[in-house]
Amino acid sequence: MAALPRGSRGLPLLPLLLLLPPLGGPRGADGYFPEERWSPESPLQAPRVLIALLARNAAPALPATLGALEQLRHPRERTALWVATDHNTDNTSAILREWLVAVKGLYHSVEWRPAEEPSSYPDEEGPKHWSDSRYEHVMKLRQAALKSARDMWADYILFMDIDNLITNPDTLSLLIAENKTVVAPMLDSRAAYSNFWCGMTSQGYYKRTPAYIPIRKRDRRGCFAVPMVHSTFLIDLRKAASRNLAFYPTHPDYTWSFDDIIVFAFSCKQAEVQMYVCNKEVYGFLPVPLRAHSSLQDEAESFMHVQLEVMVKHPPVQLSRFISAPRKTSDKMGFDEVFMINLKRRRDRRERMLRALHEQEIDCQLVEAVDGKAMNTSQVEAMGIQMLPGYRDPYHGRPLTKGELGCFLSHYNIWKEVVDRGLQKSLVFEDDLRFEIFFKRRLMNLMRDVEREGLDWDLIYVGRKRMQVEHPEKAVPHVRNLVEADYSYWTLAYVISLQGAQKLLAAKPLAKMLPVDEFLPVMFDKHPMSEYKSHFSPRNLRAFSVEPLLIYPTHYTGDDGYVSDTETSVVWNNEQVKTDWDRAKSQKMREQQALSREAKNSDVLQSPLDSTARDEL
């Protein structure tokens, strides 16, 4: 027998075995004997979730709410639906029935609890009034849904108000991953309102705390212990403590206000179950609650406004493909024309604005904006354009930019069309704006008041930045929501009369051009720079402003996604001089500064719609 090589004699066996690759490789063990062979275990099935929906007079919201629900990334065969509706005066029941018939084969199970009669509660003052009998009925329905989830051995139950839009398709899995007994996704709204409280009084009422706003604005991110979550929240039924949670009947020790969300918060407290709200991501949106005297029209428009707010920074909500949405009929709101200015290369803005106007049933004429960046010096000279002598941007000391030149010409061309077509009153939109709630109705009401009073007007700002903030502007007598405009920036949206357009064209502004939002205050003699005003006469434009405003910018300086086509370009007559200051520090597009009490337009007559939407927490 040959001898082993020198140095290898007597090596231990174990280290040599450790150097060998595993027999089974990554797929498992391929043992010598059959009983030694194995395969890795399959993953766990997705948890069983019951989604509970309660609907009353919700027809306008259903296509969007159900469409968003359909987008949730949770296996439908592991999802059950529990749906109840009653006390309706619209076709909520019919829409829900149509949807459930279409989707029942896709989900694990469907429980349908409709009640066609009665259409109102005996002690309610209107469809938005929450009476004691309504609270009690809703609590009984929530308890019935909770019992159904327990009876079917569901792992979780998701309660979701029918006007809540869950736009993040991963919301369910994200909440489940938090491993909390009761957890809610923080929902966004147009105001400070959301679906959680940070403080509660000893009587169970809302209490303002310093912790709320940083969470609501996402200055602090995470999952936070709070005394109240409502509207949309998830309960982990696997947790032993969840067995002690109830919506109805109320706890024997309960003495607080008879309110479904407070009753459930008390139940959690007694069961020693902590509620949590998570704001790590944008999960969805909800409307600000309306007052008890509000109408179903108010509610429909409020929900539609939620859809508009979603589109400001997110893709539009996809409507359910299983139900037919009502056809919209657009009009011009009583104006002779509605213009919408858009740069051809800004397709995203154009699509968002056209969709926003369509949602509000507003018909518009699309106006292709003049792209100042594409104009060369010879084109500018051929049009006889000259900058106003001595003009300098008030913040950067620079001359006019090509972007501002294009913006001015875009508005100028509309004024020309107004005169050429003899349009008595027109509405002009830019494409980077967001609408306030009840926009269409409030503006139409205002214009009716203006006509009824026979007001002599040329231009009415619908959206602007007020620059004179030392004292209040003069309220217009007998006309609600209107003031005489002082020095203002921005041309986001305005109403212009034929007479107003004629005055602006008669000033021959192309030969002494300055930015359009500086030119307008010059023409109504409110610009603080006398040297600018000296080049124009007469300065008799009759200018007013809506108060409160109905239009605001989609983005301000410093916001994610903020882009300026006016200030971020080149100097009007020198393509080598760039003006890229605006991205970081433009003062012009900063949000309106807070007004002192003395400077607020507090004397303006208010309309009922101003107080319909409740901004309080």
UniProtKB/Swiss-Prot annotation:
PROSITE patterns: ER_TARGET
Source species taxonomy: Eukaryota, Metazoa, Chordata, Craniata, Vertebrata
Renumbered residue ranges of the record's region Disordered: 582-617
Transmembrane segments: none
Recorded GO MF terms: procollagen galactosyltransferase activity
Organism the protein comes from: Mus musculus
Its job: Beta-galactosyltransferase that transfers beta-galactose to hydroxylysine residues of type I collagen. By acting on collagen glycosylation, facilitates the formation of collagen triple helix. Also involved in the biosynthesis of collagen type IV.
Extent of the signal sequence: 1-31
Known EC number: 2.4.1.50
Entry protein name: Procollagen galactosyltransferase 1
EC class: transferase
Keyword Metal-binding: no
Highest taxon above the source species: Eukaryota
